[in-house]
Amino acid sequence: MKTATCSLLICVFLLQLMVPVNTDGTLDIIGKKKVKELLAHQDNYPSAVRKTLSCTNVKSMSKWASCPAGMTATGCSCGFACGSWEIQNENICNCLCLIVDWAYARCCQLS
């Protein structure tokens, strides 16, 4: 009985690892939240200069993904279902799990 239960738990765990993750959707949601936060704290005076927000994804085959010069990391996504990450120096995504095969950084620039 113990062997069957253990085998079942292992099968369930392996099936969870096989479920695909929609990283682009997750990064877009995080980016939109960040933009809303930035816009909520701007001055109430109309700007004479029109600003545009441009964003891109940067993929790395390691635990770190760096944004291009002049861009800021607004969110991260990590491989092997790692949900633990941090942004360092405003432009580097660092995945905090022990085993990670890729990292995405959502990089944006307001110009």
Swiss-Prot record:
This is Resistin-like alpha. It is found in: Secreted. Probable hormone. Plays a role in pulmonary vascular remodeling. The gene is Retnla. Monomer. GO terms for cellular component: extracellular space. Keywords: Disulfide bond, Hormone, Secreted, Signal. Its main location: secreted. Disulfide bonds join C55-C108, C67-C107, C76-C93, C78-C95, C82-C97. GO terms for molecular function: hormone activity. Pfam families: Resistin (PF06954). Belongs to the resistin/FIZZ family. Residues 1-23 form the signal peptide. The keyword Secreted applies.
